[in-house]
Each structure stands twice: as structure tokens, then as C-alpha cells.
Amino acid sequence: MMRAEHTARALERNPVADTTTRPLRVAVIGAGPAGIYAADMLTKSEPVKSGELEVSIDLFDRYPTPFGLIRYGVAPDHPRIKGIITALRSILGRGDIRFFGNVEYGKDLMLADFGAHYDAVIFATGAVYDAPLNIPGIELEGVHGAAEFVAWYDGHPDFPRTWPLEAREVAVVGNGNVALDVARVLSKHADDMLVTEIPGNVYQGLKASPVTDVHIFGRRGPAQVKFTPLELRELAKSRDVDIVVYDEDFQYDEGSEQAMAENNQIKVMVKTLEKWRADDSPKTASRRLHLHFLQSPREVLGEDGKVVGLRMERTRLNGDGSVSGTGEYVDYPVQAVYHAVGYHGSRLPELPFDEARGVIPNAEGRVLAEDGTVLHGLYATGWIKRGPVGLIGATKSDALETVNHLLEDRPLLPPLSHPDPQSVNDVLEARGVEYTTWEGWLALDEYEQALGQSSHDAEGN
């Protein structure tokens, strides 16, 4: 972790008029939902609405496009979730937040640059990398992180256009929504995705997939899953895909009963799972999606450097919803393993970082130095602040907390030397950074939409 004095030195500034005579200059790094919500809440804060304060906000992203994981981390057959983009577009379309795409923090602009041009900086860079699954065999060909697969099927520019989809039987390790997304996309017939925004290369890859069986494994019981009811129910909507569950996986302890009594979402999901359990109709689909509970991964089995199986250990509930191993092992013959055990944030240059949690250390959004002192003017929001937990509602409340603290801290914010908004453009242009603006992105998006439509039309014929 970076020592406090190094970070403080990067923030040294020359005094200039305070924010009683000019707008408060704020940079938000990361143009996903967390960053956009934070910027939006600043513009709608009470000091701004009352006329006490003016704000000037610049939103930065290392990609030419805004929207972060909503654009590159949500399955293409989730139009309802991607509908959030409509709301985010309306925020940026107002014109009171400037967008700078294709600008990378730590490369194109350093911390000292932000310190010279902004009173405060909010980091909203998220958690986009796969948390590791530390078991033997994880290095074998055929083992993939779920985040990488999601990025591929969403057309992320950092990932190859092709993906290895030769496996007939596939394992997905994890019991959260990302695991369900991965399993659903792998098991779904490609032609049923043509009504979505699926990229053409992804459609072609999935179309050629020989998959027949996808297994989802969770180490705890049905009452401890981390899905949401909507995601779970969507599994049953896939054409020509049977849902398969197993009687021996349906165990409930006192903690399970308490969870079902106290949490309606859990009660609804258990009811859905029990309905599938009771369904004894013939399984005639050409593809099957198996849901396994109370099984923990112990080893990826391989031959000649490639995946040939996954060894799972049966677990038992301990009475409080936790589990322990039983010593009973089952080997599943699979040719690919996807691990979806969580996301992890990455270290940002010149900032402290908690490697274990994958977050910027902070106190309710105020960035902390190694010794626990507050680094005035630096803030965090979203998953880089709290870790990869919570949906859009949590992201909004999280952003509000950070913004409120930023506004409270105004008397403590260091002065800056270049308050003129145009000075940031001048720096980027002087360094040869080809940044995109909101207007430029709209033109790019319109072109991509037209290109995608013509591609879908051709594939559908």
C-alpha cells in the first residue's frame, strides 16, 4: 500500500480563489452506473439546488464509451437490465456533466493532474476482474473466469473476438447472478439470441457450440443461493433447455428456515426450486441445465493439459447456514470449467489499495492513507469502495453517501491551480490524447447500432 506522504505529495497545489467565487470542480473517474449516479447526485444536491453552490463535473473513462458493466458486463438477453442505460443516457444527455472517453487515469492524466484541475476526485472504477478460485488444476486449458466470458459475449474491446466453445459438458462454479448469466448463455440456442444486441461474432461462436449439458455448482444449500428471483425464473424460459435438479441437494437447517422466514426473496427462490424438484415430466430437450447444491470444488481434473473433469466434495449444513465438507467426492466429466466466485477490483496508480478486499481503503467514501488518515479531496464510490456486492439500488445509496461527505468536506478541500474547465482539454490535446466527448460517442453509437442491425438482418436470413 502506498505511504500517505507519497499520495499527499502528488496532490500538492497552488492556492487559488475558493468555491465561494467559482464552481466546485469535481472529476469522476469511471463512467459506469456508480460514477454517473455520483455525478448526477452532485448536480441535484441541496447546495446546488438552493443556489448556494455551483458545480462543474467531468466524467472520465478509459474506454471511448460510457456505462461500464451495464454495457460490458450484462448478458445480451437482459434487455430489462440494459434498459438502465436509457436512464443513464438521459443524465449525460442533459449537458451539465462533461464526458471524456478514452482517457486513462494513471497514463493520460496522473493524480497530480487531477489535483491541479479539480477540487475533488471520485474514483468509481468498479471491480471488473475475476476473483480467483484457488484449487489444483485451475491452470488447465478449458478453465475460464466468468468475467472474461461475459466481456467476450458483450463485445468488450479488450478481449479476443473468438472464444473456445468446444465442450459438450460444462461446469459453472458459483451461486450468484453472474453464474446464472454464464450458464444461461452457454445453454441457450444462439438463434434465440438474435432478438438481442448480441455481437455477430458471439452469435457465430455460440451457434457452433456442441454443448449439451451445463452444470451449476453451489457449495451451500437452496436457501443460501445469491441469485435474485428474476434471474432464477429466467432459466426456465430458454427454449429446448430442461432444468434438472437433484433430491439429495435439497437440505434445510435451522439457518435455512430462518432465512426463508425473514427474507421474501429467498422464500420465492426456494419455492421456484422446489417446483422444479416436483416436476416429474419427461426431460426431452436437446440441452440440459443442471443445478447442484451442497457441493464444493476441490480439483479440476486434466489430461494432456486440458480439462476432463471437475472433482466436487459434498458439503453439509451446520445449522446456521454455513457448510463443512463431508469427505465424499464426486467427479463430473466436463471439458470446460467457468468460475464465477466474485469480482475483484484492481490497484490504481498513486492510490492506497486493500489487496485482500480489492478496494480503495475508505471511510464511507473518504479515501484513507495507509495510516488511516483521510486524504482530503479523494473519494470512492461503487464496487471499488465497498466490494462487488449489491445491485443498482445499493449503488445509488452508496453514491449518495460519498457525495454527501464530499459536500461536507468543502472547507477542507485543498486549493487548485487551474480551475478553468478548458484547461483540462488543453492538457489532453497537448499530450496527443484522442479523447471522445458525449456528442462524439452518440455519433459512434448510432453508427454501431446501424451496423449491428444490418449484421442481425443478415444472420437471421
Q: Where are the model-predicted features located?
A:
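Beta1/beta-strand and adjacent pyrophosphate-binding region of the FAD-binding site
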Residues: T21-G32, E166-V173
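N-terminal Rossmann-like dinucleotide/flavin-binding domain of flavoprotein oxidoreductases
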Residues: E52, S56, Y63-A120, I266-S286, ...
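FAD-site-proximal beta/loop scaffold in flavoenzymes
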Residues: G142-P160, V300, K306, N318-R386
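Glycine-/small-residue-rich beta->alpha transition segments that form the dinucleotide
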Residues: A120, A124-A131, G176-N177, V334-R347
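C-terminal, flexible cofactor-proximal segment of oxidoreductases
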Residues: R366, D371-N461
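N-terminal Rossmann-like FAD-binding beta1-loop-alpha1 element of flavoenzymes
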Residues: V26-S50, L180-L186
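Glycine-rich dinucleotide-binding loop and its adjacent helix/turn
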Residues: D130-A208, V359-L368
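Dinucleotide-binding/catalytic capping subdomain of oxidoreductase cores
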Residues: E46-L59, R184-E328, L406-P414
